[in-house]
């Protein structure tokens, strides 16, 4: 399938379509309780602010997904969000967006990207037991994916789990934090 990248702020229609994709991705799964189309539009407007990096991917001139990167630290930025229409899941478009974002970030001399990935649907083994200071690292090391949780997508793209925030979204609903060093490797 032929695709092209676009700016989310190229038109009002593109911004509305981005909000719709965001809403449809997160509606009903509990990670964003105040989500409605208006809050999704507000999120899109935040993501297209000057200091952010934000773009989408189109097929046949229709937006099928988009990605944003926002400052977190001077040289490490946060991926927020990455969303793909459900009918295009598993077809490589998320990786295409992520690869392009990493290239743009490298050009801006960003050296690391972090991503938070909530487990509010009991999608991983981290939601099976109470996480404590004693078991946190063993649970992260032995994480299992039960419901196609996105952490596995990130790992396939070179991201490593660097920690979790236990109970971030309620009891046994952690936020999984991942990170990738995107510096270009110099030949040895």
What are these regions (language model features)?
Residues 1-16, 184-188:
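Conserved N-terminal entry element of GNAT/NAT acetyltransferase domains
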Residues 22-23, 27-54, 68:
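Active-site rim helix/loop that mediates acceptor-substrate recognition in acyltransferases
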Residues 56, 62-70, 78-83:
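Conserved beta-strand in the GNAT
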Residues 65, 163-166:
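A structural microfeature
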Residues 84, 90-103, 114:
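Conserved acetyl-CoA-binding loop-helix of GNAT-fold acetyltransferases
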Residues 105-146:
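Conserved GNAT acetyl-CoA-binding A-motif
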Residues 131-135, 154-164:
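Conserved acetyl-CoA-binding loop of GNAT-fold acetyltransferases
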Residues 147-150, 167-174:
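Short glycine/proline-centered loop/turn elements that form peptide/ligand docking sites
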């Amino acid at each position: 399938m032929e695709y092209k990248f676009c700016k989310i702020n190229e038109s009002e229609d593109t911004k509305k379509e981005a909000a719709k994709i965001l809403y449809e991705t997160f509606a009903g799964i509990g990670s964003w309780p105040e989500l409605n189309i208006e809050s999704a539009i507000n999120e899109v407007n935040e993501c297209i602010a000057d200091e952010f990096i934000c773009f989408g991917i189109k097929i046949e001139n229709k937006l099928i997904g988009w990605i944003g990167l926002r400052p977190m630290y001077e040289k490490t930025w946060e991926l927020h969000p990455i969303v793909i229409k459900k009918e295009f899941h598993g077809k490589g478009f998320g990786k295409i967006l992520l690869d392009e974002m990493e290239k743009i970030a490298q050009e801006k001399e960003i050296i690391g990207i972090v991503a938070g990935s909530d487990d509010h649907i009991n999608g991983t083994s981290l939601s099976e037991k109470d996480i404590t200071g004693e078991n946190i690292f063993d649970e992260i090391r032995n994480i299992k994916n039960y419901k196609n949780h996105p952490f596995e997508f990130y790992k396939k793209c070179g991201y490593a789990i660097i920690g979790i925030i236990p109970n971030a979204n309620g009891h046994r609903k952690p936020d999984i934090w991942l990170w990738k060093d995107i510096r270009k490797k110099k030949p040895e």
